[in-house]
Amino acid sequence: LAADDLNADGFDDLAIGAPGEAFGTRTNVGMSHLLMGSANGLTTAGNYAVAQGDGAPGAWAGGERFAASLATGDVTGDGAADLVVGTPGDWVRSQRSAGSATVLHGSPSSRVGTNASVLTQSGALPGGAEANDAVGASVAVGDLDEDGYGDVIVGAPDESFGSSTGAGMVGIR
């Protein structure tokens, strides 16, 4: 669960992770349900869901567990909170369960996920993508360097370091 003002309307919205959500015969694909806030609290109007291939980059694949972890904060500095979604089972460069974190940018004029950034160890995060690293098993947002922008913090509990398997890693972007 994560709550913040994703559409900059002055009311907190609620993101609910459903990493076990299935699509057809594919199990544990994952999805995030977004409930929009209003002056009267959470409403049924304007609610929607985001999944890989449906509002977020990527494609539906079993076992990826999209939305296993969630965090919010204004990463872009535009006044709308952004939603960070952990996908610890994501395939990255043919590496099963290497994992990723996706920043779904909040906006007053469009749905979360219209613009997105995917963070993996084959790009924005330190290290190289390896099978079973589980990048995105935990995510957080905080302004660690006090520059006014939220920094994305991504955990990978099964990252190996040298000959130490499962040593873990925290990446900050």
Spell out what each predicted region is.
Residues 20-25, 89-94, 158-163:
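Short glycine/acidic-enriched loop and turn motifs that connect beta-strands
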Residues 31-65, 100-134, 167-173:
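Blade-edge motifs of beta-propeller repeat domains
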Residues 14-18, 83-87, 152-156:
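Hydrophobic beta-strand segments that make up the repeating blades of beta-propeller
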Residues 11, 26-28, 68, 88, ...:
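Generic detector of contiguous secondary-structure segments
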Residues 1-11, 67-80, 136-149:
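Beta-propeller blade termini
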